[in-house]
Design a protein with these regions (language model features):
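A short macromolecule-binding patch
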Residues: 55-63
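Long, non-globular low-complexity/IDR segments in eukaryotic proteins
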Residues: 1-6
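Extended, charged low-complexity segments
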Residues: 37-38, 54-56
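Short, Lys/Arg- and Gly-enriched loop/turn segments at beta-strand edges
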Residues: 44-51
Length: 67
């Protein structure tokens, strides 16, 4: 995989969105602080992530710390 990098969530109860925008009807699921994720895309203040179980979505960049 190109540019494979990992991150860890540093905010409690991070909402994961269907795209790089913050809308209530776009929330797919939530993840807890300390969850490790793989970073797919970094776009402005948003990051597309994938979880170990294959769930994907977008989170605000400030909720993530690169590992």
């Amino acid at each position: 995989k190109m540019n494979e990098s990992q991150g860890i969530l540093i905010d409690n109860h991070v909402s994961v969105f269907s795209g790089p925008f913050q809308k209530n009807d776009a929330i797919l699921f939530r993840v807890n602080e300390g969850t490790k994720v793989e970073i797919l895309v970094w776009e402005n203040q948003w990051v597309e992530i994938i979880l170990i179980d294959g769930k994907k979505g977008w989170i605000p960049a400030e909720t993530l710390r690169k590992l």
